[in-house]
Amino acid sequence: MAEIKILTEKIDKRELKRLVEQCFKDMVKYVVDIRQKRIAIGGELHADAEQLLLESGSEQKDIWGANYYPGKGESGCIEYTALINIRPSSGNSSMEVIDNNLQEKIREITFELIGKGEGL
C-alpha cells in the first residue's frame, strides 16, 4: 500500500516529490480537514487518506478531497475532484467541490502545507 502522511506543517519538497512519484507521477491525491487545517497526502485513493484523518480525530463534514499538480502554478495546481466529495446532503452532488468558499479554504490550506504549484 502506498504511503499516506498527515501534514500539520509545510511538507519538504523532496518528500512531496517522493509522494508524487509513488503512484501517479504527475500529481498526488490529498484530503483536507478544513476545521483542523491539516492534510492527509499520498496513497492511491482519497478514501484511504480520508480514513486516516477520521481515525485521528477529524469529522466527516470537515474533510474534502483534491489532487495537487506540482509545476502547474497557483491557478492550475489544485483539482477539487474526488469521489469522497459526493455529498448531496451537504449540498455537493458531484465529485467536484462546488462551493467557492469551500474551494478557497482548501486552497489556503493547500498553499500553506503543500505549495503553490511550484515545480519539484
Predicted regions mapped to residue ranges:
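Well-ordered alpha/beta subsegment
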Residues: 96-120
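Eukaryotic low-complexity, non-globular regulatory regions
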Residues: 1-3
